[in-house]
A protein has these predicted regions:
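Short amphipathic alpha-helix that is part of the acyltransferase structural core
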Residues: 1-35, 135, 148
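Short loop segments at secondary-structure junctions
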Residues: 55-58, 87-88, 141-144
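Conserved acetyl-CoA pyrophosphate-binding loop and the N-cap/start of the following alpha-helix
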Residues: 88-97
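A conserved beta-strand-loop-helix scaffold within acyl/acetyltransferase catalytic domains
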Residues: 38-83
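Conserved active-site alpha-helix within GNAT-family acetyltransferase domains
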Residues: 95, 107-143
Length: 148
């Protein structure tokens, strides 16, 4: 657990307020808008996730941000679902969250660490991310389906 000025970051899923995270992703995010709850839950189970809290997780904390990393634990990691609730922005909390993710001991060996962003390039550049070569990455985008 990491603590700073009344805020905390935890990777313990027992601390996460899944309702807050899901509502933000489902209702507010541009990248996961409309994600079904069961797929959201499945994604948490298979990721290294970081919850950002005001207060002490497990006691009096409120979930105010989140990020998760999808990784094979050896060569590749993908940072995704990063957010800080609007009323907590402008306090350096997103920077601290990303700093914590990048410094996590389980994420030090991956050669490739990627992400996608529409509007936070400056934040991620502080930690070494650079735009990918044009045309290098490809993807398939499908509509959400229920998990089986």
């Amino acid at each position: 657990m990491w603590r700073r000025d009344g805020f905390a970051i935890s990777t313990d899923p027992a601390h996460f307020d899944r309702d807050v995270i899901w509502r933000y992703l489902h209702d507010e995010s541009y990248w996961a808008n409309g994600i079904p709850r069961d797929l959201f839950e499945r994604s948490l189970e298979r990721s290294l996730s970081f919850g950002l809290f005001e207060g002490e997780p497990g006691r009096d904390a409120s979930q105010i941000g989140f990020s998760r990393v999808v990784t094979d634990g050896a060569t590749f990691a993908w940072l995704c679902d990063v957010f800080v609730l609007p009323e907590y922005r402008g306090r350096g909390l997103a920077t601290w969250l990303i700093e914590t993710v990048v410094g996590h001991p389980d994420l030090q060996v991956q050669r490739g660490f990627v992400l996608a962003t529409r509007d936070a390039h400056g934040l991620y550049a502080k930690f070494g991310w650079k735009p990918a070569e044009a045309g290098r990455f490809m993807r398939i985008t499908r509509p959400y389906r229920m998990a089986e």
